[in-house]
Structure formats: C-alpha cells, structure tokens
C-alpha cells in the first residue's frame, strides 16, 4: 500500500510540474504573440525579395528610365498568370486568378538604379509559386511577368528580383 501511495505521489508531482511548464509557455505566447510555436519545419515559409532596378529600366518615349510598379503574388499555380494579359490580371485580379490566388502580397514602386527589400512575406498554406507582375510602359515588348517555385512550409527563402530594361527576373539566392 505504501508503494502505491508513493507512486501516486510521484505521479501527481510530475503532472503538477508539467502543468506549470505548460502554463508558463501559454503565458509567454499570450504575452508575446510573435513567439514561434513549434519547430522551424512546420512554420509557414517566409520570403524576401531583394529588388534591383537597372539604371535603364522601363524607358519612356524620350528614352529616359522610369519607375516600375511591381506586384508580388502567392499562388497555388501560375498558369493563369501566363494565360491572361496585364490588364485582365491587374484590373480584376481576384476574378481572373480565382482560387489560384493565395495572397496578393503587395505592390511597390521601384525607381531606376535603386535597391529595395520587399518582405519578408509569410506565405499562406497551399502556396506553390511566387509571381511578380511588373508594370512596364511597353507591355507589348517587355517580359512583364515571372514566377518561381516555393514550398509553403518550413523555408526562409531569399530571391533576387531584377528589373531590367524590358524584363523582370526572379532568381532564388542559394546559401
């Protein structure tokens, strides 16, 4: 009987200590919602874009460089981005992209010969692609859209976004 009582006492003390530790963690998360809960591998992917606009980007009719407005999108698939024209995408983005649009991550104007960091963006669940749409003045000649593959969970990705004369490029930075 003494053994059973001793075992019971040890079990109750162990549960009490575990409850205290759990309560402390819950308090920490409530007091600071930015605290990570869970391992890195199960956290949403974060993506940053280091954007550089070339000195000769987006030349106007007088040959002078002009700012470029870029929009960053989180997508489950990029097939619709490459199927529609610029104005169909930008004028009614949610309707045109439908369920493939996981999130519109934002729009930014980038001036010629400048560097700017976009993000970090936390990707929503189901994101398979990051796409960039760039508003070049001559949309007929320019390569104004690009995309790259991403995972929606467990990564912290850095991309180089190059805004060249008449072309937008998105390149994953390794390392």
Language model features: what each stretch is:
Residues 127-138:
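A short, solvent-exposed beta-strand micro-motif common in secreted/extracellular proteins
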Residues 1-8:
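Bacterial N-terminal signal peptides that target proteins for export
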Residues 14-40:
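Bacterial Sec signal peptide processing site at the extreme N-terminus
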Residues 22-25, 145-150, 155-175:
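Glycine-rich, aromatic-bearing surface loops/beta-hairpins
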Residues 62-71:
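Short coil-to-beta strand junction motifs in C2/discoidin
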Residues 115-122:
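Exposed aromatic-hydrophobic patches
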Residues 91-104:
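Short beta-strand and strand-turn-strand segments in soluble, beta-rich domains
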Residues 49-61:
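Short amphipathic, basic-aromatic surface patches that mediate peripheral association
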């Amino acid at each position: 009987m003494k053994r059973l009582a001793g075992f019971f006492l040890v079990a109750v003390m162990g549960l009490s200590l575990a409850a205290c530790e759990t309560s402390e963690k819950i308090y920490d998360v409530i007091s600071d919602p930015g605290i990570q809960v869970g391992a890195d591998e199960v956290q949403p992917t974060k993506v940053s874009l280091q954007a550089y606009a070339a000195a000769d980007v987006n030349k106007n009719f007088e040959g002078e460089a002009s700012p470029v407005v870029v929009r960053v999108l989180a997508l489950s698939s990029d097939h619709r981005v490459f199927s529609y024209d610029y104005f169909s995408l930008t004028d009614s983005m949610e309707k045109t992209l439908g369920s493939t649009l996981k999130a519109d991550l934002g729009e930014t104007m980038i001036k010629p010969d400048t560097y700017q960091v976009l993000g970090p963006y936390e990707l929503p669940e189901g994101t398979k692609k990051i796409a960039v749409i760039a508003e070049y003045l001559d949309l007929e000649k320019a390569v104004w859209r690009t995309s790259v593959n991403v995972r929606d969970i467990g990564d912290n990705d850095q991309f180089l976004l190059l805004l060249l004369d008449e072309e937008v490029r998105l390149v994953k930075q390794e390392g």
